[in-house]
UniProtKB/Swiss-Prot annotation:
The name this protein goes by in its record: Tigger transposable element-derived protein 5
Organism whose genome encodes this protein: Bos taurus
Region (Disordered): 1-50, 197-236, 366-395
Family statement: Belongs to the tigger transposable element derived protein family.
Molecular functions (GO terms): DNA binding
PANTHER family in UniProt: TIGGER TRANSPOSABLE ELEMENT-DERIVED PROTEIN 5, TRANSPOSON
Subcellular location: Nucleus
Residue ranges for the DNA-binding region feature of this UniProt entry: 79-99, 150-183
Cystine pairs: none
Domain HTH CENPB-type as annotated: residue spans: 117-190
GO cellular component, one term: nucleus
Length: 643
């Protein structure tokens, strides 16, 4: 057996001695006991650092969604089920139920389905202007009128002045227009080419009550009205029906030159003095197009280096000064269609119109011009009939077109509306202004006046005379020209006709009185019968072929000075004041002509509308008189258009 002995004593730990040459290091002291860490001091007062906190996603609901939730709750569905489907808490749904009257009212203010897509109930700052512009926009889009941003902005400012007065400072900026578009859901689209007029605007809006179409005063149109369908339903309104008429005019013929043989007049006429004038206007007379003057000069000197678009009348060349088919076609597409489209767009009307012409023009310009002494029946027989069917004149979309009232000799002649007194009134007004110019230039001979009165002055006189024709006269002439095509007028309109006719008769008599007075003032030996013959000389005729023709012995007319003379009632001291002044050196004829030509060059550079033809004609007449008295040759500053 083993016996327990004394406990074993562990052997002492040997210390490793450092290698020779290295000192022995002392033993490491025991590690101190760990001391508990003290709390950090509280942070100093100041802005707390941002801490990224994950927030719940916030969704905005449209008015349409809110109304759907309200309708489901009103239908008996539990609010918890509706909240679960829409993902909103119960408090949000109860807020929607509380704001239901406000939501309905907001939809009434915006109108249509556009408001249901809105997420905020925010109206415009100027609600009246916004509502007026939107109603105006819907009304125009119902008629297919294209609208641009600047046009809508200008109309908004006009509404602001009407609502708040002329002192209103409202400005329809681009930002206002953008917000107005977004508020009503209107988009901008670019239009390419000429498209059919749309029936309704692109913006959805409230249903507009359609009123029955009012009967227009134009009835069935002859020949082509039934065969060619209108570009849009509803026919043509009064402002969309136009008429064009052609007439001849001696544009510088004075009463003394038109005196018959044996009456003591010169009776000499010039072929170059005759032009053809095309007049066109709509039924109401509210839109009168620029007169078209057709002459025999291919390049009139007085029209060179001038912008003819600024003249109140247009000029075209024809060998016989008559309207041909190419001229009618060019005028239709270059002047009539653009002018009518601008007027219809400005008047907020549908882009369609019809032009009534008495008969188609000659296919060529070789028609014999009837003599003045021939009867009316002979004149009509001399007018050649078209060799082929008349050309279809209309725009590619068919919105603007031409209808001929008479196509041939076998059909009944339908008088054009403008032939019922409007053309005669235009000629009387033109000749009155021509006589006024002749009287104002009474210091020289009639030949000086005829040389100084150029084709450019004639265009201004033609435009002025056409502007003086009243719109009521044009409207009344339609009842005489196409009486069977109009529907019966109401009693109140028929009762008002005599007053208008009496006013027109008074205006006609006043023009005739002015003509007689001016003729008596300018010509001493002229009888009233000769003035009447001069007025009606170019009603239906042209000139015989052969250029210049003498109808009797020539005699220069006697012109009574009636221009810038001093009245006889003035005292002699005033009339003879110039003699008492100190005499100065008299300029020579060359110096006077050079000064007058310098003044003419300056005057022609001014605005023609402010200067007018009177001053130019007077100055040219003075130049011709000075050259004639000084024995100087013709002036290059006074070109001759008609002689």
């Amino acid at each position: 057996m083993y016996s327990a002995g004394p406990p074993a004593v562990p052997a002492p730990r040997r210390c490793r001695r450092p290698p020779p040459g290295r000192p022995m290091q002392p033993p490491r002291p025991p590690a101190p006991a760990p001391v508990p860490a003290a709390r950090p001091p509280p942070p100093a007062p100041g802005p707390r650092p941002r801490v990224a906190v994950k927030m719940a996603f916030r969704k905005a609901y449209s008015i349409k969604d809110k109304l759907q939730a309200i309708e489901r709750v009103k239908g008996g569905e539990r609010q918890a089920s509706v909240c679960r489907d829409f993902g909103v808490p119960g408090g949000t749904l109860r807020g929607w139920l509380k704001d239901e009257p406000k939501l309905r009212w907001f939809l009434e203010q915006l109108g249509g389905e556009v408001g249901t897509q809105r997420k905020k109930m925010r109206l415009a700052n100027e609600e009246e202007i916004d509502r007026a512009v939107y109603s105006w926009f819907l009304a125009l889009r119902q008629h297919g009128v294209p609208l641009s941003g600047p046009l809508i902005q200008a109309q908004a400012e006009a509404f602001a002045r009407q609502i708040y007065g002329p002192e209103c400072t409202f400005k329809a900026s681009h930002g206002w227009f953008w917000r107005w578009q977004k508020r009503h859901g209107i988009s901008s689209q670019r239009i390419y080419g000429e498209a059919e007029p749309v029936a309704a605007g692109p913006a959805p809006g409230p249903p507009v009550k359609q009123e029955p179409a009012q009967p227009t005063r134009a009835g069935p149109l002859p020949d082509r009205a039934a065969s060619t369908p209108a570009p849009a339903e509803g026919g043509y309104g009064d402002e969309q029906i136009y008429n064009a008429n052609v007439t001849g005019l001696y544009w510088k013929l004075l009463p003394e030159q038109a005196a018959p043989v044996g009456a003591g007049g010169c009776g000499r006429r010039w072929r170059g003095d005759r032009v053809t004038v095309l007049l066109a206007a709509n039924l109401t007379g509210s839109h009168k197009l620029k007169p078209l003057v057709i002459g025999q000069l291919p390049d009139p000197p007085s029209l060179r280096h001038h912008n003819q678009d600024k003249f109140p009348a247009s000029y075209r060349y024809s060998p016989d000064a008559w309207l041909s088919r190419p001229l009618l076609r060019g005028w239709f597409f270059e002047e009539f269609v653009p002018g009518v489209r601008r007027y219809l767009r400005r008047s907020c009307l549908q882009q369609k119109a019809v032009l009534l012409v008495a008969h188609p023009p000659c296919p060529s310009s070789e028609a014999r011009m009837p003599a003045l002494e021939e009867s009316e029946e002979t004149r009509r027989r001399c007018r050649p009939e078209p060799t082929g069917p008349p050309e279809e004149l209309q725009t590619p979309d068919g919105a603007v077109r031409v209808l001929f009232l008479c196509r041939g000799s076998g059909r009944a002649h339908i008088p054009a509306p403008l032939e019922q007194g409007v053309v005669a009134a235009f000629k009387q007004l033109y000749k009155r202004e021509l006589l006024r110019l002749a009287v104002s230039c009474a210091g020289g001979s009639p030949l000086d006046f005829m040389r100084s009165f150029m084709l450019k002055d004639m265009l201004y006189l033609a435009g002025l005379s056409w502007d003086l024709v009243q719109a009521g006269s044009i409207e009344r002439c339609w009842l005489l020209g196409l009486r069977a095509a109009f529907e019966p007028r109401p009693v109140e309109e028929r009762a008002g006709q005599p007053a208008g006719q009496a006013e027109e008769a008074a205006e006609h008599s006043r023009v005739l009185s002015d003509l007689t007075h001016l003729a008596a003032l300018a010509y001493k030996r002229l009888a009233p019968e000769e003035v009447a013959e001069w007025l009606h000389l170019d009603d239906d005729g042209g000139l015989p072929d052969g250029g210049r023709e003498d109808w009797g012995p020539s005699r220069p007319p006697v012109l009574v000075p009636g221009g810038p003379l001093l009245p006889a009632s003035l005292p002699s001291a005033v009339a003879g004041g110039a003699e008492e002044e100190e005499e100065e050196a008299i300029p020579t004829a060359g110096e006077a002509v050079r000064g007058l030509e310098t003044a003419l060059r300056w005057l022609e550079t001014q605005d023609p509308r402010e200067v007018g033809p009177l001053k130019l004609v007077q100055l040219r007449s003075l130049i011709s008189t000075a050259r004639r008295l000084g024995g100087i040759g013709p002036s290059p500053m006074v070109p001759d258009d008609g002689l």
